[in-house]
């Protein structure tokens, strides 16, 4: 029963199905709805500039899982997501994209290790178009289930975000603040406490471009490589792109109602150390009801 529970949780979180013997395609449909809260949406480092907000979230994905062999599976999905914020409506988002996920299992039984390869692309359209962009992400993960209740994995991720708008305000400095790239590594573990409850932890480190939106500030100005006005948070706020390292610790809990639905909670604590001694923190939490057909 615990193996069935874990398969449900993984599917709801990753839009992926387990490996099955038949060579026919299995249709997938996922729908999520929830709420989120972020204590520092604009990633400001001065307390007077920090802005917090909450949002309603909706997402859906549909596609097919193909059992290529007894050990190999390929999942192809198209997905859509939306975020609607309470205060900062410029962050309201509609995103459309697609994902390809390949999984290989090295042997039989629950203890056999696996490898996961994921490629995804999306277009994000925001109410304030400074953030409009196309995203591409590549991810690789290797993991193993050590008991029927406990598994662990580690992986790496490459991210690229292509900004659609370039509103330069300083001669010689780009206005494509949200033209970003980064690399990250992570380790995660999950434990099924019961037939319904799954707990998880993840630690990650990311190095790459980050964006901080603050009021005009000389300290961050001199270390930025892109600058643009950011009316989302106020007429006197400016978005700055700079290099930084972000450390993230995340705790998760998932409660399965049945074989198709679950309630998922996640809490994340982030710290970013950026060029020029800029340091900022954020805390976020989200609660999502996930359903799979």
Cite the ranges covered by each PLM segment.
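Residue-level signature of outer-membrane beta-barrel architecture
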Residues: 62-66, 102-106, 142-144, 148-150, ...
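Detector for outer-membrane/organellar transmembrane beta-barrel domains
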Residues: 139-234
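Membrane-embedded beta-strand positions in outer-membrane beta-barrel channels/transporters
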Residues: 57-61, 95-101, 137-139, 184-186, ...
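Repeated loop/turn-to-beta-strand initiation elements of outer-membrane beta-barrel proteins
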Residues: 70-74, 107-115, 146-154, 195-201, ...
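Transmembrane beta-strands of outer-membrane beta-barrel pores
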Residues: 33-41, 64-66, 80-86, 104, ...
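Outer-membrane beta-barrel "beta-signal"
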Residues: 255-256, 280-293
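Short glycine/proline- and aromatic-enriched beta-strand/turn motifs that initiate or cap beta-hairpins
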Residues: 25-67, 83
């Amino acid at each position: 029963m615990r193996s069935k529970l874990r398969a449900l949780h993984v599917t709801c979180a990753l839009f992926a199905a387990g490996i099955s013997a038949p060579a026919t395609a299995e249709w997938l449909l996922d729908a999520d709805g929830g709420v989120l809260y972020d204590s520092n949406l604009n990633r400001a480092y001065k307390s007077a500039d920090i802005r917090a907000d909450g949002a309603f979230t909706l997402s859906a994905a549909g596609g097919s899982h193909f059992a290529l062999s007894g050990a190999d599976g390929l999942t192809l999905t198209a997905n859509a997501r939306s975020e609607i914020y309470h205060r900062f409506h410029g962050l309201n988002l509609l995103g459309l994209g697609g994902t390809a996920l390949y999984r290989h299992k090295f042997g039989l039984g629950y203890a056999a290790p696996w490898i996961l390869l994921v490629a995804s692309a999306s277009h994000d359209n925001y109410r304030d178009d400074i953030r409009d962009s196309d995203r591409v992400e590549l991810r690789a993960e290797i993991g193993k289930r050590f008991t029927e209740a406990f598994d662990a994995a580690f992986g790496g991720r490459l991210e690229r975000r292509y900004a659609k708008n370039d509103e330069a305000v300083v001669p010689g400095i780009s206005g494509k603040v949200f033209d970003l790239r980064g690399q990250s590594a992570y380790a995660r573990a999950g434990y099924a406490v019961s037939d319904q409850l799954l707990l998880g932890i993840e630690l990650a480190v990311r190095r790459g471009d980050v964006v901080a939106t603050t009021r005009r500030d000389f300290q961050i100005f001199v270390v930025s490589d892109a600058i643009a006005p950011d009316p989302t948070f106020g007429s006197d706020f400016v978005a700055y792109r700079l290099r930084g390292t972000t450390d993230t610790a995340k705790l998760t809990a998932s409660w399965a109602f049945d074989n198709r639905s679950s309630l998922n909670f996640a809490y994340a604590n982030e710290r970013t150390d950026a060029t020029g001694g800029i340091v900022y923190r954020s805390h976020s939490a989200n609660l999502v009801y996930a359903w799979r057909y």
